Amino acid sequence: MRYLVTAGQACLALLLAPGLVGLIRWMKARLQNRRGAPVWQPYLELQKLFRKEVVVSRNASWLFRAAPYVIFASAVATTALVPVLVAPAALDRMGDLVVLVYLLLLGTFFLALAGLDPGSAFGGMGASREVTVAALAEPTVALAVFSLALSAGSTNLGQIVVATLADPARTVSPGHALAFAALFIVTLAETGRLPVDNPATHLELTMIHEAMVLEYSGRYLALIQWAAAIKLLVFFALLGNLFVPWGVARELTTEGLLLAAASFLLKLLVLAVTIAVLETRVAKLRLFRVPELLSVSFVLALLAVSSSFLLR
């Protein structure tokens, strides 16, 4: 039964991810006094891209064609490890912090290789920037979640949720707040949101993620965009269910699963509104200021770990 719930959780993430991106776009447009595209616009864009012909550069190798599938598969795999509806889940023994970080790095690694493969100037520039951001961001993800693992006594994501549900007082600890702030900053960087990157631009010299996918078209581009939306949802799930796990089901009952789904949707809505408001209030940072922001998040995560050690 737990395997069915895990499969349903992955399918739910696949279905909700494009809508989450569309919701953020729609709310940003409303906050800027624009009508904006409908929430379901990303679904229409994916449908259009899957129907389009694939155009590949003559200089591209097999790696360029294989990368979108690896990126998409790694993103889908993370949805099965993160506790979304129930904890512990069927793949709980494999849902370790280290596995999650390496799956996230796998997608970033192949995306950077795909940007370098055709030999275009924009792709190489974006790949170098993406690797720089990932080198600063991924250790912060590990440290932020590790601070929670210290309190729970396990690096298993499901066990962290169960331990937090058993002792709700730890959610108001200083280490908890510092880890949440660190992971929130990393979420902005890893998903290409403002102030680190602007997801609405395609021809800026300062772009990061979009520079690596300029050579892609058709179903390859659709898979990469879908994977990026799934990655955003996974980070939202980490922020919502690891730090505020109320609503996550501990038993496989119909009422518990429905409550878990409703609470998860509510958390997604709150985080989407937060991102939309933030992106309408802040400007994009200069590229050389991005490492400074990520260094702040790393220090916050380090303080969270130190706080967890001191307050044990």
Residue ranges, per PLM feature:
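Alpha-helical transmembrane segments
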Residues: 6-20, 92-105, 169-190, 257-260
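Cytosolic juxtamembrane amphipathic/interface segments immediately preceding
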Residues: 45-64, 121-125, 213-220
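Transmembrane alpha-helical segments that form the membrane-embedded catalytic/substrate-channel core
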Residues: 19-27, 107-115, 181-198, 269-278
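Transmembrane alpha-helix boundary signature
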Residues: 54-57, 76-92, 111-120, 150-156, ...
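Interfacial loop-to-transmembrane junctions
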Residues: 274-300
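Juxtamembrane/interfacial segments at transmembrane-helix boundaries in multi-pass membrane proteins
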Residues: 89-93, 147-178
